[in-house]
């Protein structure tokens, strides 16, 4: 058995934590009092259940495990408190014996007349020792699917493997059975021939033997080069070994990413045009993206102009569509970041470079381990629960999308070593305490108040003028990705699509270049500014101004909670039309109640009393110890 609590696999702690979370308040506090004596820290952990919806038992054990608590201490404490069910779950676990998966080999040839790839190094060593070599080949369309050998960690449908790697598919009625599994990527044929296979000589010639002058970027697992074939530019991703990678990792990664790329066909997913598994290297071939990555454009690298808001919102909408499409195929990208959102000549986003993860069926395979120094740069886009627990779920992609949305909204890099805090996610999540203390957070939700704080402090000023309520809608979408554990991508995408539709309609009436690009609020366009914080008003106050609104504007499609955005956007459009067609609307005399000044301490007490009546706050937190 593991010596320390932090050495227990995360899936082992899942059941005990759920069991402990279901205890009564008295029993749980009795257990917690033996673990932690600092009441302030205990209250902080307890509040995480209400604010962030996390397991308080897991947070407690994490805190205890970081102080070198042992598994024996945990089991003894559970037995002393007669919590035998949780103790037995831990005692029943035994470390599974380490199983070494055989390294999949590549075919000696993919065409009878031209060899393409060699077997892996391990297979060569076994052959020298006289041991039989098991070759995993890619059968043709006429081969039986059962003969295709797939890696143990990747189990796509059996008919996908043979039909994904060949383009000469039969046109008979028998092919109808494969209509849902045959990737549509096969229509994107490379110029090297009528197949996705590229020979080693073709790749070497196109890249000038991977000349350093052609290198575009260098990543953790691959280097990216630019090359030409028949006058057409291509991008070549050359996989490479890392210092801490295991033997055969390139081959496994190559096969996994190849299978996933060939299953995807979406306008916002970067298509694969070919691949090469040569003796000296493994490479993927992609179309060349003229506008680089979203990260480059946001940071203005190469002297590029700042992206205006309509294009920024359109890129965000395309990214969310791509991730939603992958999740529909049960594929977890797990590498969503602004540097992997590539832009073509029309600034259409293309999500690239997945880490090749299929949604696993086995519960234990949902957890992953990652080397620290490989993981540092990606940590800026990963949620805290994944960093602690290592459980790979779709929420990892959704959280990463929230960080990209925040980068687009604020123009702040996801990671900056010269900034405190270093990660943008920590900067945004630090707004939660002040947001929860706001008097309107109980009515409009923590995400909405948090979004207002983010817009007031960090909204990008150099991309032109963005209406306040559109900015808050985008910030709310980002906050939903960052905070909610069961966020619906459809809900987030609906909000972003509503803003995109409104900006597109406004751009048709007034070109975006005619708006002020130097400030976030233009002095040429009137704004509804009051001396009070408008965030304290709920949606009903927004509807009350509709009777005196000016010319009607087309309402945006309502989908998944977009009603608030539709009313707000109408107010913004009507207020801009007021500058040309008429005087300001009359003020409602019933709205003067905001002038009543309430003592801040009294207001806080009134809020706590309401929470106490709703059983969301106990007496200790209400009156203090």
Swiss-Prot record:
The modification Phosphoserine is found at residue 144. PANTHER family: INTERLEUKIN-1 RECEPTOR-ASSOCIATED KINASE, INTERLEUKIN-1 RECEPTOR-ASSOCIATED KINASE-LIKE 2. It comes from Pongo abelii. This is Interleukin-1 receptor-associated kinase-like 2. GO terms for cellular component: cytoplasm; nucleus; plasma membrane. The keyword Lipid metabolism does not apply. Residues 111-181, 513-539 are annotated as: Disordered. GO terms for biological process: cellular response to lipopolysaccharide; interleukin-1-mediated signaling pathway; intracellular signal transduction; Toll signaling pathway. The lineage of its organism: Eukaryota, Metazoa, Chordata, Craniata, Vertebrata. Pfam families: Death (PF00531), Pkinase (PF00069). Keywords: ATP-binding, Nucleotide-binding, Phosphoprotein. Residues 13-94 form the Death domain.
């Amino acid at each position: 058995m593991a010596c320390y609590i932090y050495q227990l696999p995360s899936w082992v702690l899942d059941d005990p934590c759920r069991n402990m979370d279901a205890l009564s308040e008295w029993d749980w506090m009795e257990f917690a009092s033996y673990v932690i004596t600092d009441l302030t820290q205990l209250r902080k952990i307890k509040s995480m259940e209400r604010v962030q919806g996390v397991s308080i038992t897991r947070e407690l054990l994490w805190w205890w495990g970081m102080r070198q608590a042992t598994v024996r201490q945990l089991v003894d404490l559970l037995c002393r408190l007669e919590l035998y069910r949780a103790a037995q779950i831990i005692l029943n676990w035994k470390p599974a014996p380490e199983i070494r998966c055989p390294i999949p080999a590549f075919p000696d040839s993919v065409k009878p007349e031209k060899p393409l790839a060699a077997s892996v190094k391990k297979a060569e060593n076994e052959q020298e020792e006289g041991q039989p070599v098991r070759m995993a080949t890619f059968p043709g369309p006429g081969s039986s699917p059962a003969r295709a050998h797939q890696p143990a960690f990747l189990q796509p449908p059996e008919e996908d493997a043979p039909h994904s790697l060949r383009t000469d598919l039969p046109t008979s009625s028998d092919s109808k059975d494969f209509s849902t599994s045959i990737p549509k990527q096969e229509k994107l044929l490379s110029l090297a021939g009528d197949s996705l296979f590229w020979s080693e000589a073709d790749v070497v010639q196109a890249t000038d033997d991977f000349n350093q002058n052609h290198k575009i970027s260098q990543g953790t697992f691959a280097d990216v080069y630019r090359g030409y074939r028949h006058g057409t530019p291509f991008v070549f991703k050359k996989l490479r070994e890392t210092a801490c990678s295991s033997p055969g990792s390139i081959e496994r990664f190559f096969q996994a990413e190849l299978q996933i790329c060939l299953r995807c066909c979406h306008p916002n997913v970067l298509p694969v045009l070919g691949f090469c598994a040569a003796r000296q290297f493994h490479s993927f071939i992609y179309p060349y993206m003229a506008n680089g990555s979203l990260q480059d454009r946001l940071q203005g690298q190469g002297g590029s102009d700042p992206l205006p808001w309509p294009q920024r919102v359109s890129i965000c909408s395309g990214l969310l569509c791509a991730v939603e499409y992958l999740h529909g195929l049960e594929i977890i990208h797990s590498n969503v970041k602004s540097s992997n959102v590539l832009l073509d000549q029309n600034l259409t986003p293309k999500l690239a470079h997945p880490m090749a993860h299929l949604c696993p069926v086995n519960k234990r395979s949902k957890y992953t381990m990652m080397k620290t120094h490989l993981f540092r740069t990606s940590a800026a886009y990963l949620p805290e629960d994944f960093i602690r627990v290592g459980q790979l779920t779709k929420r990892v992609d959704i959280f990463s999308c929230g960080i990209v949305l925040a980068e687009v909204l604020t123009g702040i890099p996801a990671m900056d070593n010269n900034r405190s805090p270093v990660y943008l996610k920590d900067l945004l999540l630090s707004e939660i305490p002040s947001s929860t203390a706001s008097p309107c957070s109980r009515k409009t939700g923590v995400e909405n108040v948090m979004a207002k704080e983010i817009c007031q402090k960090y909204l990008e000023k150099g991309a032109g003028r963005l209406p306040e309520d559109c900015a808050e809608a985008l910030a709310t979408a980002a906050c939903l990705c960052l905070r909610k554990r069961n966020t619906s991508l459809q809900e987030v995408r609906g909000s972003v699509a509503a803003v995109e539709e409104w900006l597109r309609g406004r751009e048709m009436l007034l070109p975006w270049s005619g708006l002020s690009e130097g400030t976030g609020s233009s002095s040429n366009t009137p704004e509804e500014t009051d001396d009070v914080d408008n965030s304290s008003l709920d949606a009903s106050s927004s509807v009350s101004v509709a009777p005196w609104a000016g010319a009607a504007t087309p309402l945006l499609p309502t989908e998944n909670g977009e009603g608030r955005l539709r009313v707000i956007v109408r107010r913004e459009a009507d207020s801009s039309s007021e500058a040309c067609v008429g005087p300001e609307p009359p003020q409602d005399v019933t709205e003067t109640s905001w002038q009543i000044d309430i003592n801040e301490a009294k207001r806080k007490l009134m809020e706590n009393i309401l929470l106490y009546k709703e059983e969301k706050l106990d007496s200790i937190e209400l009156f203090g110890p």
